[in-house]
């Protein structure tokens, strides 16, 4: 298995964590355990891993989409992409690896349980430390591909100043 998803019990049901949430949890856990080198994630993934790496004094690379690019990061300590592909032990497997990811996630969950907390509590701790960044995939289909270029040009020319009533603080 090359992928690993995680879900948490919430209000009598289960909520699947996003790839970005799981990536933040894994990156933070590995950094707290003394990881050295560089973290990496694809450009379509959250910027949160970069903040986590900076907080712990680690390097961070943003790569093109696809694990072949993440795996090329020099001194890779941890890499992920939002499509639930994680590389928590690049010295053992320098690719996305669901098996080693499940072992690391189980260890993190056990740590949370021992502290009478949860994975969601740990995420809140991460957000309190480095800032919250939430992502949500958006898919739309068009028949005329030039519409995508037009839409991106329009957003670049006049970036939004607010989203869902909240001010936009920075546009990259």
Question: Can you say where each PLM-predicted feature lies in the sequence?
Answer:
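Phosphate-binding and adjacent anionic-ligand microenvironments
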Residues: 1, 9, 15, 33-172
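EF-hand and EF-hand-like Ca2+-sensor regions
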Residues: 6
